[in-house]
Curated annotation (Swiss-Prot):
Matching InterPro entries: ThiC (IPR037509), ThiC-associated_dom (IPR025747), ThiC/Bza_core_dom (IPR038521), ThiC/BzaA/B (IPR002817)
Species lineage: Bacteria, Pseudomonadati, Pseudomonadota, Gammaproteobacteria, Pseudomonadales
Gene name as annotated: thiC
Protein name: Phosphomethylpyrimidine synthase
Cofactor: [4Fe-4S] cluster
Provenance organism: Pseudomonas aeruginosa (strain ATCC 15692 / DSM 22644 / CIP 104116 / JCM 14847 / LMG 12228 / 1C / PRS 101 / PAO1)
Biased composition (Polar residues): 1-24
Amino acid sequence: MSATQKNNITRLEQLDRQSTQPFPNSRKVYLTGSRPDIRVPVREISLADTPTAFGGEKNPPVFVYDTSGPYTDPEVRIDLRKGLPDVRSRWIDERGDTEILPGLTSEFGQARLADASLDALRFAHVRTPRRAKPGANVSQMHYAKKGIITPEMEYIAIRENMKLQEARAAGLLDQQHPGHSFGANIPKEITPEFVREEVARGRAIIPANINHTELEPMIIGRNFLVKINGNIGNSALGSSIEEEVEKLTWGIRWGADTVMDLSTGKHIHETREWILRNSPVPIGTVPIYQALEKVNGVAEDLTWEIFRDTLIEQAEQGVDYFTIHAGVLLRYVPLTAKRVTGIVSRGGSIMAKWCLAHHQENFLYTHFEEICEIMKAYDVSFSLGDGLRPGSVADANDAAQFGELETLGELTKIAWKHDVQVMIEGPGHVPMQLIKENMDKQLECCDEAPFYTLGPLTTDIAPGYDHITSGIGAAMIGWFGCAMLCYVTPKEHLGLPNKDDVKTGIITYKIAAHAADLAKGHPGAQIRDNALSKARFEFRWEDQFNLGLDPDTARAFHDETLPKDSAKVAHFCSMCGPKFCSMKITQEVRDYAKENGLSDESKAIEAGFQEQAARFKDEGSVIYRQV
């Protein structure tokens, strides 16, 4: 065994231990469907009883959406060198419309497999790929249009509901503000039939390549919970396979619904295989990045044949959605000339350069129907890239951006003709007053295909804090109807994010997505808020920590000033101290009302005023007293 292999194994063993830690006071629960192999994971957070001083009652557990896969299940033995357990193979086999290939069919994939020098880096258990039988279409959209409810659709319905019926019966939905959904059609309960209808209509997608059988199915659409994406990937300047797998497991632990591998450095093929085999969430890529590497970074040397081989290579590995910049047309490129920041999309700039060098139309546009044929053979979803997105607020909503968006709408209809699933990528940098126009125009141009935006960043003045500038825009556009939000880390515009940056970006965007769900009035969205608020009022500190998006940070901040265990039951924190805690004072008012037989707090407060006034008179009505 080489030194490199030994180092890889040691690092991966460390990742194994780190990735399998359950959240505090939480356990993985599986909700079963109509068949025993539909086992949908949710996280159950157990809560302490309400103290006697606050009425003394049992608090039901809170169920939350769980993207962490088997990693947080102590019953599952995780070995990153072997990959995750299979979830979907039986479902795919039962449909009878796919075939196992004799081996990899892409030229590049075959060449990498034959290169013995890569053995130390290669994932050891490379699976034989499958593909649709000749003439077959294996997309979830195709099944949906035929009226078929797949196991994936049933799985998603259970996952989106998270025991909503039980919560409603327990009265947990009674305290939720009505939302404003801007025309979205959010039902009181998600059913498998509703999932099928939304996918058939094109309003939602299920990114689920038939070669990614480790996947736990999820859905992206404006009538479902708002999802978030986390980006990982190496660059020519750094990172390793182990670091990228670590970012993957770390990102999904904190709530990434999908992950994009944006690698542009060495060993892109091998890195992607490790990521896919260990990912329970959909993986997206930008295939033009790898195609560019194959021509040594010279955009003019790109060809349709190289790109086509790259699509097949990645589809056979199991990539669930491709960002394809087919809307960057030759006639739009001059529209960017007077922009403050020009073309900021890597994929957009690559295709713009190719178009200008050859003075030909974008080959991704001219070969789009051929791309659709590949996509439906593996059920890869389109994420139609916004190659002309604004890179500064000054460039927002200009002719180049909206011209491309109109073309993406045209391409969406072509993809739907082939029953290929589509979502649309969006900006970028947009000031707050222009965000709704983006959402409205996307719904109009793309006929309600799911929107997937990078932020948008609402101001350009905060390098190092762009997770905040973009989180503001993300919450807004999520409320207006955006289906998935691509996270931004503090390193945006500055450098390659590390593990800590990934966590910060994920938590920021979980906040934005949840705020959007609350504003839309998504059924059950407020259950967790209510449970945490109740725990806060009752000084159940551990429950406060555990119900939060980041229990570790909440606990650490509390313990910076009050580290002793006794502080975990104290009726105050270090912000106000014991005498100025508003919640403690409120409880004292309630206790006073109860002791004095008063029916409400306002009467208790008034009685307290009268009692103090009488005491003042009894003591001589003296303002200042000698002490």
